[in-house]
Amino acid sequence: MSHNKMENNDCICGNNSQPIENNKCSISFIVNDYINTKNTNTAPTTNNNNNNNNSSRDFFDPLTNSNRRCYVINFLNSVCYIRNQPYNIIIHRNAIEKICDCRIFIANEISIYNSLKTKDDLFLNMINLTSFINDCVTELIFLDSFQSSLVIDIQMFSNEIGTRNVPNRKIPTPVLPPLVSDNNSTNLQNQISSQTITSQSPHINNNNTITDANLFPRKRRLNVNNYIVKETMELSKKLRTTNQTSDDYNTPKIIRKLKLRPGDCYMCPNIESNNWRNFIFNGQHITLCNACGLRMIKINKKEKEIQNSMFTTR
């Protein structure tokens, strides 16, 4: 990667770089037009109700949109294209913000997928849900890996004053395919091969580091935390109502506050959870928060039941 300073800060890739192919969408295009976080709390809409919004609304409905995987992989390929350009700190910071937006979008997309009513076609929808969750986990692993690489680049080549260094850690780096067509319905995890590399943190003086506030805006983290707290409260209410027996109303219940522990969930932007769960995905150990872990256990259980029923019918 060449790291010569660029003077033009208006574009993502720079004037000295070759243009991205026509089949790849730029980061700004995808994030601004397809990953609009202001609309992620609303229900999926159809083309009949939003004819003036082109096809951006359809991207929020993973059940009906066949182009979702193509959009996401093109976004990831466009992010990778940044590190082939001369180093520019503004472009790197913008890319980190876009990655954070993409992580929030995927988490909200998972929530929308789970909230849809799928009783009419439970067999097919459970298979689609399992494939969709596996795709999202793979995408989040790649986003976390590339975001760490951008942070290390900024540490190594920027001259700004800060207060904190990023520690060394091993980062799994999936290798994405150069192009994905709309007709490709295979699982994303079958197209991606994982490679583990060791990222070395550079030697930096105490006066030559950067702050977390510039890389991870506090406002965005607060929004993510509010989303996680809301999901946890709704889940706890459902558990209390389903586990209540006829004798429970005579005994007063003591509700204890959950002790949150810091961590990093690969499925959602959650950084605190009362229970962190470990899973193996593509031969790699990943960590999920309690809510995402429960969803993954439930999905795996139903998938096994479906496979057993298919085996017995034969």
Curated annotation (Swiss-Prot):
Domain of life: Eukaryota
GO biological process terms held by the UniProt record: regulation of DNA-templated transcription
InterPro entries documented for this protein: Znf_NHR/GATA
GO molecular function, one term: zinc ion binding
Gene3D superfamilies in alphabetical order: Erythroid Transcription Factor GATA-1, subunit A (3.30.50.10)
Name under which the protein is recorded: GATA zinc finger domain-containing protein 19
